[in-house]
Amino acid sequence: MTKRVLISVSDKAGIVEFAQELKKLGWEIISTGGTKVALDNAGVDTIAIDDMTGFPEMMDGRVKTLHPNIHGGLLARRDLDSHLEAAKDNKIELIDLVVVNLYPFKETILKPDVTYADAVENIDIGGPSMLRSAAKNHASVTVVVDPADYAVVLDELSANGETTYETRQRLAAKVFRHTAAYDALIAEYFTAQVGESKPEKLTLTYDLKQAMRYGENPQQDADFYQKALPTDYSIASAKQLNGKELSFNNIRDADAAIRIIRDFKDRPTVVALKHMNPCGIGQADNIETAWDYAYESDPVSIFGGIVVLNREVDAATAEKMHGVFLEIIIAPSYTDEALAILINKKKNLRILALPFNAQEASEVEAEYTGVVGGLLVQNQDVVKESPADWQVVTKRQPTETEATALEFAWKAIKYVKSNGIIVTNDHMTLGVGPGQTNRVASVRLAIDQAKDRLNGAVLASDAFFPFADNVEEIAKAGIKAIIQPGGSVRDQESIEAADKYGLTMVFTGVRHFRH
């Protein structure tokens, strides 16, 4: 019995060679449109799809394979006489292999000048239908959606005259994943077009980026996936210039670091991070001095940490960083000399480059947090704040230097794990108190870390003070300026305590919990 393959592909990589090998094995080839032209031009004899259907391609190719002669040939069960008799009675030829990939919908909508009409025209209808029909009948039909699978199919056909059931089942599973992702991407596009922010169904499409050695701990299996529509300013899209593959924890920490530095666009800034918390932030008129401040913030914790810089890394800065053990360095660019310094004798140092000019576009993405049996979705904490909207609630107003320091501290506290406290001056962090289960413990931790550098320091809290004991601790340490959201039923007690000790305190009206 003659074996038949239907080939209709938009990605023609390797298809001529694949078809030529099938011909050598005695297969009859049915093809459509541009695929048929490509195969015919290569000297591969094919049968036109309309010779199979008895119906011409029409409506600019929208209707060509949606026909019983095609889907009957794909769906007929070879183990049921009734199916085979129905095929024979209706002159339906059986199809044993389907090779289809879909209209480039993703590539189309990624074009900067794409129109809605272009997007709609690149929604494939016939292709997914054939793939699904063939995949459903994988007991008898082999279906190929990925050119990477051509070789294994040819190997099995050459060796055995047919593919194994295990291969057909695996390829069918791949097809259903592929068509599901294709439809999900179309749904995502249309959902955005109509402005629907809370769809009743949520399907996310990601592609495998990296198979990881392990997850957060060695006993945890893990992989890294990238959005089907990539975000330019993201670790998934970063260009790695040196070093080993990123680990699971590297990726989470690096993501936290590039989020933090988005809030420090106005001046050269360096952020050092460890275990999802900033351990040093420095800001200056040049990137080398900003590094100095970030390093001096906490020379101990930065060891084995991640550093992100928002300006090009020059040789002088690279020379200083070279002397510190770091896991990852991230920057918009590096001078050739700086890169040579960093790579020298540090073959494992992971060096990444990111397009910092794409930061704003990354801020509009939703955040997803998995919980057992569910998924939490929220927009990112990127609310635009202005000191003009803040309220000084104490009798004493901040000095100009304090006001600058408070603004710096308020940017920095946003990414400290709750309950979060941070102590800074106007250009660097001095002490961080993250993740304590009561706020006064976080206050003590941050103050203890800042120690003898508290002269002129200010303190920021990610949420309100529930009791005045926090202010008492702050005043006792000698800190004279506080910034916090306010909003406690006991705010007045904290205000009175601040006035008692001559402190200035600013309420922002915006909470920045981070869990």
Swiss-Prot record:
Enzyme Commission code(s) on record: 2.1.2.3, 3.5.4.10
Signal peptide segment: none
Disulfide bonds: none
Organism superkingdom: Bacteria
GO annotation terms (biological process): 'de novo' IMP biosynthetic process
Keyword Hydrolase appears in the UniProt entry: yes
GO molecular function: IMP cyclohydrolase activity; phosphoribosylaminoimidazolecarboxamide formyltransferase activity
Catalytically driven reaction(s): (6R)-10-formyltetrahydrofolate + 5-amino-1-(5-phospho-beta-D-ribosyl)imidazole-4-carboxamide = 5-formamido-1-(5-phospho-D-ribosyl)imidazole-4-carboxamide + (6S)-5,6,7,8-tetrahydrofolate; IMP + H2O = 5-formamido-1-(5-phospho-D-ribosyl)imidazole-4-carboxamide
PROSITE patterns in the record: MGS
Name of the protein this chain belongs to: Bifunctional purine biosynthesis protein PurH
Organism: Streptococcus pneumoniae serotype 19F (strain G54)
Gene field: purH
